[in-house]
Amino acid sequence: MSIWKSFQNGIIDRGRNMKRTLIVATTSYAGMGPYVSEIVNTFSPEDDVYFFFHDYEDDFFKRNIKKELHKKSVFFKQANSAINKLKELLLNSEGYDSLILDVCREFQIQMVHYINGLPSIKMQRCLEQNGINILSTVHDLSPHEAKKVWYKQFRQIVSYKRMKENLLAANLLVTNSQNQYEELSRRFPEKKVYFHDFPSLVTSEIANGTKIPVELNHINKPYILFFGRIEEYKGIRLLFTAFCKSQELNNNYNLVIAGNGQLNIDTQKANSNVLFINRYIHDEEIAYMYKHAACVVYPYISATQSGVLSLAFYFKTPTLTSNVSFFRKIIEESQGGLMFENGDVDDLTEKIIALLHMDVSKMKQNQADYYRLNYNPQAIKNTLMDIYNNRK
């Protein structure tokens, strides 16, 4: 039996102007899993949209994509292993391109939306030769600051080089960053560039989670939270330094740095008021961390687009961010947090203390209002359907 029988004859009649679309998700790594699932779950079985998911060992997509869409989905399981990463690096292929082409032919797909990034030039050419349009979501046009072991750094360099090459070949692009939208439009006036809002990262598993991270059982003071994958560009060392230099913060609070990744901090020299939860944080643990935090800090050195504020705003956690343009736009519009001068340790310390001493009731209301109005899944779906059907 063909693998495509998983679609279970989910073909539906198309309107005259409808373009049958296949959304391809190539990774659930880091925040990409919730990003994809929250967008995909806005669709219904009645929409002329199909789905191809590359799942890892944890079956993230199979667990988080709503059941009613499974009959129109293919879940291709391939381990996120070192050998598979090496193959992808050497061959410049995801390893399932032929399967995507098969489903496009069998179900007469007219547009493929690569929701995690740009497909290879070879894959773009193959799809175009079959009369299929390609829409690619551009996430990070330029690489962020990074401090990685040599082979990961090399992989990042190669990946961005290929991304630039793939970008030159692409015709239809979409991004979730207004600044990036403007830059893409300026650099590539011959291409069609679209924008839609970044989705909320609050999945049902996150919203309904009740699990307490075991490490927090030993916390005996209110805590300041950083949560996210550990990356150099997120400014974690800046936050660590700002906290450690303040006697007031050390006397009254703990700093919790939670997330998987390479810390690049000498944890042996950290004082007892700093707790590193340096592991993968399960979705069921996130609600507790945010609900019980005195505040959350996002000290990013750079940020193109991010969904982290959706977590803070959903749980109404007092928020402090750097004033990089992406955060500044949301904080100024929502009044849902405070900002500090990017890279300024002293200002970061002062703003943390100010946030912890202020009445945050209005801030929390602003967060709730902004979340309700701006993390609107129906609006994202409507925008994408317009793009798919050439109405924008």
Regions found by a protein language model. Name each.
Residues Y96-D97, M111-V138, P143, T304:
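An aromatic- and histidine-rich active-site surface loop
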Residues E215-K234, F240-C244, L255:
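Conserved donor-binding/catalytic core segment of Leloir-type glycosyltransferases
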